[in-house]
Swiss-Prot record:
The lineage of its organism: Eukaryota, Metazoa, Chordata, Craniata, Vertebrata. Mn(2+) binds at residues 10, 58, 143. This is Superoxide dismutase [Mn], mitochondrial. InterPro entries: Fe/Mn_Superoxide_Dismutase (IPR050265), Mn/Fe_SOD (IPR001189), Mn/Fe_SOD_C (IPR019832), Mn/Fe_SOD_N (IPR019831), Mn/Fe_SOD_N_sf (IPR036324), SOD_C_sf (IPR036314). It catalyses: 2 superoxide + 2 H(+) = H2O2 + O2. Its main location: mitochondrion. Gene3D superfamilies: Fe,Mn superoxide dismutase (SOD) domain, Iron/manganese superoxide dismutase, C-terminal domain. Belongs to the iron/manganese superoxide dismutase family. It comes from Eptatretus stoutii (Pacific hagfish).
Length: 144
């Protein structure tokens, strides 16, 4: 269970700041592109990655939530979990261990590897987006 206060803080403060900041960076980037200012374009990349990643990650995070919980996985997802992890409980153990292992700020993810057609657990530092850093398609994210 995550309190309403924490969710409000995440939505109205954290996520909103990422969206506002990525919009500012996009404006500066467009200006630098128009001027052919490569130095500024390069210098904006860390802020673009951090704030853009924060927006991407939190957008996925909100889609993962439900006021009454999501229940147990079923269908193809359950089959994939059992095939790749043995059981839902084993997946949960590994995902929690990955989240606990994140040093500082970051994310623990359940992602889908399109090449191997398998589920994988991965972590990303700070607000680095899963797909952009690992190539995995994000299914479930835990903000650490």
């Amino acid at each position: 269970h995550i309190s309403a206060e924490i969710m409000q803080l995440h939505h109205s403060k954290h996520h909103a700041a990422y969206v506002n900041n990525v919009n500012v960076v996009e404006e500066k980037l467009a200006e630098a592109l128009g001027k052919g200012d490569v130095n500024t374009q390069v210098s904006l990349q860390p802020a673009f990655r951090f704030n853009g990643g924060g927006h991407i990650n939190h957008s996925i995070f909100w889609r993962n939530l439900s006021p009454s919980g999501g229940g147990q996985p079923c269908g193809d997802l359950l089959k994939a979990i059992e095939n790749d992890f043995g059981s839902v409980d084993k997946l949960r153990e590994k995902l929690v261990a990955a989240a606990v292992g994140v040093q500082g700020s970051g994310w623990a993810w359940l992602g889908f590897n399109k090449e191997s057609k398998r589920l994988q657990i991965a972590t990303c530092a700070n607000q680095d987006p899963l797909q952009g850093t690992t190539g995995l398609f994000p299914l479930l994210g835990i903000d650490v």
